[in-house]
C-alpha cells in the first residue's frame, strides 16, 4: 500500500466535519496558518542568507552540520531527503567559502565527515538566533493563555512527522542529548 493509500484509508470523516474533525473552513485556516508561519519562520534567515549569496538549502545543511559534527554525507542526504547532486552543489559553495570542512573518516576512508568551521558556526548561530526569537515570541504569547505552549508545540510538531519516521527523528535529536521526551 502506498503512503497516499494508507493516509486516505486512515482518515474517517465524521458527517459535517472534515478530516481534522473541524467544521467548515477551520482546517483550511489551520493549514493556511502553517503556510504563513513557515513563510515567516524561514523569511528571517532568508534575508541574512541573501547577503552571502546563499539560500534555504545552505541553511538546512548548516543547521544539521553545526548540531551534529562529523555527520556523514549519507546521513545528511537521509535527513534532508535531497539528491546527492543537489547536496554537492550546496556543499561546494559552503566548503569553498569556508563555512564547512569535510574530513575523511578514520574507520572508513570512503566516508566524508562534515564539520562547521568557526565562520559556519557563527552564521548558523545568527540564523538560529532570528528563528529562536520568533519561536520564543510565539510560545510566550501562547503560554500567557495556556501555560503549556512549549510542550504542546513540541508534541504537535512531532505528530506532524510521518509515524514511521518519528523514532528516527527522536534518535537524531537524542544525539544532541535533547531527544523527543
Map each language-model feature to its residues.
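N-terminal leader segment of winged-helix/HTH proteins
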Residues: 1-52, 180-181
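N-terminal helix-turn-helix DNA-binding core of bacterial DNA-binding proteins
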Residues: 43-86
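Hydrophobic/aromatic-rich alpha-helical bundle segments in the mid-to-C-terminal region
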Residues: 22-24, 135-146, 167-175
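Exposed, interaction-prone assembly regions rather than primary DNA-binding/catalytic cores
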Residues: 148-181
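Charged, amphipathic alpha-helical coiled-coil/dimerization segments
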Residues: 4, 42, 92-158
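DNA-binding alpha-helical recognition surfaces that contact promoter or target DNA
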Residues: 89
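Flexible interhelical turns and helix-capping residues at alpha-helix boundaries
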Residues: 38, 69, 80, 84, ...
Amino acid at each position: 500500500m502506498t503512503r497516499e493509500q494508507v493516509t486516505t484509508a486512515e482518515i474517517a470523516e465524521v458527517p459535517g466535519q472534515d478530516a481534522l474533525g473541524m467544521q467548515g473552513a477551520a482546517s483550511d485556516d489551520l493549514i493556511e496558518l502553517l503556510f504563513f508561519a513557515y513563510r515567516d519562520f524561514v523569511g528571517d534567515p532568508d534575508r541574512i542568507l541573501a547577503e552571502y549569496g546563499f539560500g534555504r538549502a545552505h541553511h538546512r545543511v548548516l543547521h544539521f552540520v553545526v548540531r551534529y559534527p562529523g555527520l556523514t554525507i549519507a546521513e545528511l542526504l537521509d535527513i534532508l531527503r535531497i539528491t546527492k547532486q543537489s547536496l554537492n552543489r550546496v556543499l561546494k559553495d559552503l566548503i569553498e567559502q569556508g563555512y564547512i570542512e569535510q574530513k575523511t573518516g578514520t574507520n572508513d576512508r570512503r566516508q566524508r565527515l562534515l564539520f562547521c568551521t568557526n565562520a559556519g558556526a557563527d552564521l548558523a548561530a545568527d540564523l538560529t538566533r532570528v528563528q529562536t526569537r520568533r519561536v520564543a515570541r510565539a510560545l510566550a504569547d501562547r503560554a500567557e493563555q495556556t501555560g503549556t505552549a512549549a510542550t504542546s508545540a513540541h508534541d504537535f510538531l512531532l505528530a506532524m512527522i510521518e509515524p514511521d519516521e518519528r523514532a528516527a527523528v527522536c534518535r537524531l535529536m537524542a544525539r544532541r542529548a535533547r531527544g523527543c521526551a
